[in-house]
Amino acid sequence: MALQAASFLPSSFSINKEGKANVSLKETSLFGVTFSDSLRTDFSSLRTRRGCRQISQTGAIRSQAVATTPSVNRATGEGKKTLRKGSVIITGASSGLGLATAKALAETGKWHVIMACRDFLKAERAAKSAGMPKENYTIMHLDLASLDSVRQFVETFRRSERPLDVLVCNAAVYFPTAKEPTYTADGFELSVGTNHLGHFLLSRLLLDDLNKSDYPSKRLIIVGSITGNTNTLAGNVPPKANLGDLRGLAGGLNGMNSSAMIDGAEFDGAKAYKDSKVCNMLTMQEFHRRYHEETGITFASLYPGCIATTGLFREHIPLFRTLFPPFQKYITKGYVSEAESGKRLAQVVSEPSLTKSGVYWSWNKDSASFENQLSEEASDVEKARKVWEVSEKLVGLA
């Protein structure tokens, strides 16, 4: 995504509505940016308010699973367990960074990728076009703009009885030229509702599943953005991210009882995206503070570099889409291909050297990863707590 900046003892673990854990140990980066046999899903409507454009999707998906659950093999003689294939869910895996990451992991033969996508057929075509081994991926429907869809995804995933070792929250929408807000099926401004709230609910619901994993390194990765970091040049390009006092978020981002912007200001499509990415990075850190010590799960965020050709810019003006890639390649020298960015995210998923929790990873010109600093707002502990608590209420967890 071009705008995006970038063992453990087995235990019994549960998350309550207050976001606290009950644990019982047993043995213990100018820019950078199966399904079971069948699944039937109703697409939710994306609603607009006060003259905003209406987006409606209603339909059903029915498809066969493309792979079976990998088994855990037992070594003979010594009774040791042979490491099984890892299982990773990647949202937004039908294009861009998500697809590149899915391909990079699947091609190793060491990972089974659950491609969680809104458009099943698009994802299926993308996987085939990318040459991904059929036995190493499964496509499942997920519309992050619908909380019901998120819940149904979790239920369907659990029915598959597949383990969950890593969750990658990658999907995002971006409407930089929008003058009026569009809303999700639940009435939230679309950028924040999809990029932040949808992922927030998904992560919370799947936290239990992650903790049950017997994989050596369990991880929850939320893709961040350099544009949400005001300590960078890209982060200071107007409009700058600013969550303010969260009055819009607390009001439900519905454009009726409150502003559709987190800070309560007038709507700006580009700022809404940047604000959503600040929420993503704050959420990662709050996950780390609340759950890392008790669960051993690694929580991380990243900026994989400037993917100037990404489909994330499909809503931008044509001139921008034409000039931005060569600008990044030849002027800023910050351009990163989708394939390279996918390899970087795959590193955060699988590399033993990147298990540190609470970290925001970036890459230098030599493609070496390093721990980057977040802006003052994106690392504000109290604001992270408030975003967490308000988000819990909005998605029905409190």
Swiss-Prot record:
CDD domains, alphabetically?
LPOR_like_SDR_c_like
GO BP annotations listed: chlorophyll biosynthetic process; photosynthesis
UniProt keywords (A-Z) are: Chlorophyll biosynthesis, Chloroplast, NADP, Oxidoreductase, Photosynthesis, Plastid, Transit peptide
Q: Where is this protein localized, as stated in its record? A: Plastid, Chloroplast
Q: Does the keyword Kinase apply?
A: no
| Molecular function GO labels | protochlorophyllide reductase activity
Pathway listed for it is: Porphyrin-containing compound metabolism; chlorophyll biosynthesis
Is Heme found in the keyword set? no
First-tier enzyme category under EC = oxidoreductase
A cellular-component GO term for this protein: chloroplast
Q: What is its EC number?
A: 1.3.1.33
Give the chief site where it resides. plastid
* Annotated catalysed reactions: chlorophyllide a + NADP(+) = protochlorophyllide a + NADPH + H(+)
| InterPro entries the UniProt entry points to | NAD(P)-bd_dom_sf (IPR036291), Prochl_reduct (IPR005979), SDR_fam (IPR002347)
| Similarity field | Belongs to the short-chain dehydrogenases/reductases (SDR) family. POR subfamily.
What does the UniProt record say this protein does?
Phototransformation of protochlorophyllide (Pchlide) to chlorophyllide (Chlide).
Name it.
Answer: Protochlorophyllide reductase, chloroplastic
Organism of origin: Daucus carota
